[in-house]
C-alpha cells in the first residue's frame, strides 16, 4: 500500500456542510470527508480514502481467517435460481432478492448470501469424512434490494461482505469451527477499533438454530439489544427475558364499564392500575390465513421477527377483518372469544393466573379473569420484545437496553442446506450423511460505518491508527515559504522512509481551511509546520483523538511518532 500521498493529487472532494440526505453521523462524515459518493439509492462509490480503510479492514480479516485455517476463494455474485429452489429459499426470501434473466431466459439471482453456491460447490467434491472439516470464505459485493435503503453504508442495497462456510462431519467439529470463527470475529472487531458485544441473535432467513451477532454499540444503531452485568446479551429479536409480570386481582369475574379505554394507556389511567397488570390483545392473520389473537403483557410490545417465527408471514388485522372475525377493536379478551379464532399468549404470561382483559364488548373489560376457570390458552409463543428492566434469563438481575450496529454474525446451520440440496459425504461406516454446516458473515462496508460512529467528534472523524487511511498528515502552513516548504518535504520523506503512511497537504490554502480538512478527514496524527517552529527546530504535533498538542524536536519527530503509531497498528 502506498505510504505517501500529496493532498493536491488526492481525490477527496470534501464538503463544508452536512448533506440533507444524511441522517447518521457516519453517513454525514463519510460524505463530507470525501470518502464516499452516492450513485443511486443504496448504491455508493468508495473513494480513495475509504478504499484504503476497507483494504485495511480486509487485511485484518484475512489475517484472522488464515490463523484459523479458513481458505479464501471467490464465487460468482450471480447464482442460478435453481439452486435457490433446491434450498427452498427462492420463494421465501421475498422482494429483497434481486432476480434476473439472461438472454436465454434462464433465471438467476444476485446473491445477498451464498449458502447455496458454496453447498453446490462442495457437494460433488467433498465425498469422505476424511476430507472434513473445510472452511471456505470470500470477500465480495453482495446485493439486497432493500425497500428503503438509508443511513449510507449502514443499510445499502449493494455492500461488501466477508462470508465463510464450514462443512463438518460431526456436531463436535461444527462446534469447533463455529467457536473458531466467533473468537476470530471478536478479535477482528477489536483490531479494527470497534467495541462490539456478542449477542444471542435470531437466524432469520439464513436459518439454523444457533446464532450470535456482534453489535457495535452506537446510539444511532438500528438494532436494539438488552444486556446484563453478568455478561449475557441478546438482540431483542431473540432475547428470551424473564418478564416481571404484575398479577391482576383475585376475585369473581367482574365486567366493568371502561368507556373509550381502547388502549392500554387509557385503561391504566381509568382503572388506576399499572400497565404491567393489564393484558394486551393483538389481532392478526397468520401465515396460513387464520384469524389469530395473541395476548402479551400490557407494558410490552410484540416483536415482528419473533412474530414471524411464530405465525409465519402474518399481518395485523384491518378494521374490516376484525369485524368479519367478530372482534371488537380495543376490547378483545380471552373470555368468550368467537369460534374459529387461533388463541395464543406469550410465554411471559404462562404463570399469571389473574388477568385484566377486554370483555369482547365495546367499552367493557373484565376484572379478575382467572386462567383455567374463565378461559384457557391453548398455545404459548415467544413474541414479546425484551426491554430495559426485564430480568436476565441467566442470572435474574434487571437488564439494560442499548442500540447497536450489527457488524458480523455467526450461524450453526446444521443440515438445513445440505439436506435440501443433497450434499452428502460418506462417514466412517460408508453411510451417506448430510454435511453439518456453519456460515459466518462480516459486513466490511458496514464495519467502516461502525468505526466512524464510535470514533468522531464535532469536527469530524477520529480514525484509529489500525484502520486509518493514512497515519500522519503533514500540514505546512505556507507552502510558498522558502523555509517551511522544504522542511515539509523533508519531514514527509523521512516519515515515509520510516514506514509510516503520510498525507502531505501541499495545497496553497489558508491555514484554517487546512486545519478544518485535517480534522474532518481525521488522520490519527497531524504534524503542523509553521515558520516560527521550523526556525526553532520544532514541529507541533496534534493527536486527533484527544486534541492534545506536543512540541517535538525535528530530529526526534520520526522516532516520536513511530513509538506511538507502530504499536497501534492492527
Regions found by a protein language model. Name each.
Residues 1-570:
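NTP/phosphate- and nucleic-acid-binding module
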